[in-house]
Regions:
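DNA-recognition helix of helix-turn-helix
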Residues: 81, 130, 139, 145, ...
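Structural recognition of an alpha-helix C-terminal capping motif at a helix-to-coil junction
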Residues: 30, 44-51, 55, 66-78
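Short, charged helix-capping/linker segments at alpha-helix termini
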Residues: 10-18, 29-48, 63, 155, ...
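Sigma70-family region 2
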Residues: 10-11, 50-65, 87
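Internal acidic/polar
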Residues: 2, 90-116
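Arg/Lys-rich amphipathic alpha helix in sigma70-family domain 2
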Residues: 59, 73-94
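N-terminal module of bacterial RNA polymerase sigma factors
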Residues: 1-27, 124, 145, 171, ...
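Short helix-capping/turn signature of helix-turn-helix
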Residues: 23-26, 34-35, 135-142
Length: 179
Protein backbone atom coordinates (compact mmCIF):
# COMPACT_ATOMS: atom_id res chain seq x y z
CA UNK A 1 0.00 0.00 0.00
CA UNK A 2 1.64 3.20 -1.11
CA UNK A 3 1.18 6.69 0.16
CA UNK A 4 0.42 7.65 -3.44
CA UNK A 5 -2.60 5.33 -3.51
CA UNK A 6 -3.90 6.87 -0.29
CA UNK A 7 -3.42 10.33 -1.76
CA UNK A 8 -5.43 9.29 -4.81
CA UNK A 9 -8.20 8.03 -2.52
CA UNK A 10 -8.14 11.37 -0.68
CA UNK A 11 -8.74 12.97 -4.08
CA UNK A 12 -11.80 10.72 -4.59
CA UNK A 13 -10.15 8.58 -7.29
CA UNK A 14 -12.62 5.72 -7.85
CA UNK A 15 -9.97 3.42 -9.35
CA UNK A 16 -7.78 3.86 -6.28
CA UNK A 17 -10.74 3.08 -4.02
CA UNK A 18 -11.45 -0.07 -6.02
CA UNK A 19 -7.80 -1.10 -5.79
CA UNK A 20 -7.78 -0.65 -2.00
CA UNK A 21 -11.02 -2.62 -1.74
CA UNK A 22 -9.66 -5.51 -3.83
CA UNK A 23 -6.38 -5.62 -1.88
CA UNK A 24 -7.97 -5.71 1.57
CA UNK A 25 -11.44 -7.25 1.26
CA UNK A 26 -10.11 -10.74 2.07
CA UNK A 27 -8.31 -9.70 5.25
CA UNK A 28 -11.12 -7.46 6.47
CA UNK A 29 -13.75 -10.12 5.72
CA UNK A 30 -11.92 -12.70 7.81
CA UNK A 31 -11.64 -10.21 10.68
CA UNK A 32 -15.35 -9.47 10.45
CA UNK A 33 -16.33 -13.15 10.38
CA UNK A 34 -14.62 -13.57 13.76
CA UNK A 35 -17.36 -11.44 15.27
CA UNK A 36 -20.38 -12.00 13.05
CA UNK A 37 -21.02 -15.38 11.39
CA UNK A 38 -23.79 -14.41 8.97
CA UNK A 39 -22.67 -13.48 5.45
CA UNK A 40 -25.32 -10.78 4.92
CA UNK A 41 -24.38 -9.11 8.21
CA UNK A 42 -20.69 -9.26 7.30
CA UNK A 43 -21.42 -7.60 3.94
CA UNK A 44 -23.32 -4.79 5.70
CA UNK A 45 -20.54 -4.28 8.24
CA UNK A 46 -17.87 -4.24 5.53
CA UNK A 47 -19.85 -1.76 3.47
CA UNK A 48 -20.13 0.56 6.48
CA UNK A 49 -16.46 0.01 7.26
CA UNK A 50 -15.30 0.93 3.76
CA UNK A 51 -17.50 4.03 3.79
CA UNK A 52 -15.89 5.03 7.08
CA UNK A 53 -12.40 4.23 5.75
CA UNK A 54 -12.92 6.29 2.59
CA UNK A 55 -14.46 9.25 4.43
CA UNK A 56 -11.91 9.23 7.28
CA UNK A 57 -8.79 8.67 5.21
CA UNK A 58 -8.31 12.39 4.60
CA UNK A 59 -7.57 12.93 8.31
CA UNK A 60 -5.25 9.92 8.56
CA UNK A 61 -1.52 10.46 8.84
CA UNK A 62 0.21 7.78 6.78
CA UNK A 63 2.75 5.88 8.90
CA UNK A 64 3.40 2.90 6.68
CA UNK A 65 1.48 -0.05 5.33
CA UNK A 66 1.31 -1.97 8.62
CA UNK A 67 -0.11 0.99 10.52
CA UNK A 68 -2.63 1.61 7.74
CA UNK A 69 -3.72 -2.04 7.67
CA UNK A 70 -4.06 -2.07 11.48
CA UNK A 71 -6.17 1.09 11.31
CA UNK A 72 -8.52 -0.52 8.78
CA UNK A 73 -8.79 -3.66 10.95
CA UNK A 74 -9.72 -1.47 13.93
CA UNK A 75 -12.41 0.23 11.84
CA UNK A 76 -13.91 -3.18 10.96
CA UNK A 77 -13.71 -4.43 14.57
CA UNK A 78 -15.42 -1.27 15.82
CA UNK A 79 -18.15 -1.56 13.18
CA UNK A 80 -18.71 -5.23 14.07
CA UNK A 81 -18.98 -4.34 17.77
CA UNK A 82 -21.40 -1.55 16.99
CA UNK A 83 -23.49 -3.97 14.93
CA UNK A 84 -23.58 -6.48 17.78
CA UNK A 85 -24.46 -3.82 20.34
CA UNK A 86 -27.30 -2.64 18.16
CA UNK A 87 -28.60 -6.20 17.95
CA UNK A 88 -28.46 -6.33 21.77
CA UNK A 89 -27.04 -9.84 21.76
CA UNK A 90 -23.76 -9.10 23.51
CA UNK A 91 -23.21 -11.28 26.57
CA UNK A 92 -19.56 -10.29 27.12
CA UNK A 93 -17.19 -12.96 28.31
CA UNK A 94 -13.74 -14.38 27.63
CA UNK A 95 -10.75 -12.01 27.65
CA UNK A 96 -6.93 -12.33 27.32
CA UNK A 97 -3.96 -11.15 25.11
CA UNK A 98 -2.87 -12.99 22.02
CA UNK A 99 -1.76 -16.50 22.78
CA UNK A 100 -3.42 -19.78 23.46
CA UNK A 101 -1.63 -19.98 26.80
CA UNK A 102 -3.40 -16.83 27.90
CA UNK A 103 -6.86 -18.29 27.51
CA UNK A 104 -5.92 -21.65 28.99
CA UNK A 105 -6.05 -22.24 32.72
CA UNK A 106 -3.27 -24.36 34.20
CA UNK A 107 -5.57 -27.37 34.09
CA UNK A 108 -6.40 -26.86 30.39
CA UNK A 109 -3.25 -27.69 28.40
CA UNK A 110 -5.45 -28.99 25.57
CA UNK A 111 -6.15 -25.39 24.50
CA UNK A 112 -2.43 -24.76 24.05
CA UNK A 113 -2.16 -27.73 21.66
CA UNK A 114 -4.83 -26.46 19.27
CA UNK A 115 -3.88 -25.12 15.88
CA UNK A 116 -4.96 -21.60 15.04
CA UNK A 117 -7.61 -22.97 12.65
CA UNK A 118 -8.99 -25.30 15.34
CA UNK A 119 -9.12 -22.45 17.83
CA UNK A 120 -10.97 -20.24 15.32
CA UNK A 121 -13.48 -23.04 14.75
CA UNK A 122 -14.08 -23.58 18.47
CA UNK A 123 -14.41 -19.87 19.18
CA UNK A 124 -16.89 -19.56 16.32
CA UNK A 125 -19.16 -21.92 18.27
CA UNK A 126 -19.35 -19.48 21.20
CA UNK A 127 -22.41 -17.22 21.43
CA UNK A 128 -21.93 -13.74 19.89
CA UNK A 129 -20.89 -11.97 23.09
CA UNK A 130 -18.40 -14.62 24.13
CA UNK A 131 -16.97 -14.77 20.63
CA UNK A 132 -16.60 -11.00 20.55
CA UNK A 133 -14.62 -10.77 23.75
CA UNK A 134 -12.46 -13.80 22.96
CA UNK A 135 -11.58 -12.30 19.60
CA UNK A 136 -10.77 -8.91 21.10
CA UNK A 137 -8.48 -10.54 23.63
CA UNK A 138 -6.88 -13.39 21.75
CA UNK A 139 -6.70 -12.21 18.14
CA UNK A 140 -6.80 -8.42 18.36
CA UNK A 141 -4.55 -8.21 21.42
CA UNK A 142 -6.70 -5.88 23.52
CA UNK A 143 -6.02 -5.77 27.27
CA UNK A 144 -8.70 -6.22 29.93
CA UNK A 145 -8.73 -2.46 30.39
CA UNK A 146 -9.12 -1.78 26.67
CA UNK A 147 -11.92 -4.32 26.32
CA UNK A 148 -13.69 -2.86 29.34
CA UNK A 149 -13.52 0.58 27.75
CA UNK A 150 -14.63 -0.67 24.31
CA UNK A 151 -17.58 -2.58 25.73
CA UNK A 152 -18.43 -0.03 28.39
CA UNK A 153 -17.89 -2.50 31.24
CA UNK A 154 -15.73 -2.44 34.37
CA UNK A 155 -12.42 -4.29 34.38
CA UNK A 156 -13.73 -6.53 37.17
CA UNK A 157 -16.72 -7.45 35.02
CA UNK A 158 -14.44 -8.23 32.10
CA UNK A 159 -12.23 -10.41 34.34
CA UNK A 160 -15.17 -12.38 35.68
CA UNK A 161 -16.51 -12.78 32.17
CA UNK A 162 -13.14 -14.20 31.17
CA UNK A 163 -13.53 -16.98 33.70
CA UNK A 164 -17.02 -17.83 32.46
CA UNK A 165 -15.82 -17.78 28.87
CA UNK A 166 -13.02 -20.20 29.70
CA UNK A 167 -15.57 -22.57 31.22
CA UNK A 168 -17.76 -22.30 28.12
CA UNK A 169 -14.77 -22.95 25.86
CA UNK A 170 -13.78 -25.96 27.98
CA UNK A 171 -17.33 -27.33 27.62
CA UNK A 172 -17.02 -27.00 23.85
CA UNK A 173 -13.61 -28.72 23.97
CA UNK A 174 -15.14 -31.63 25.87
CA UNK A 175 -18.11 -31.82 23.49
CA UNK A 176 -15.80 -31.84 20.46
CA UNK A 177 -13.59 -34.54 21.99
CA UNK A 178 -10.45 -32.47 22.57
CA UNK A 179 -10.42 -33.35 26.29
Amino acid sequence: MSEQLIERIRNKDQLAMNQLYREYIGLLSSVCYRYVPMEDDVKDILQNSFIKIFTSISALEYRGEDAFRNWMVRVVVNEALLFLKNRKKLQYTDVGTATLQQIADEGEPEIERLSSAELHQLISELPDGYRTVVNLYVFEGYSHKEIAKLLNKSENTVSSLLQRGRKKLKTILEKEGYV
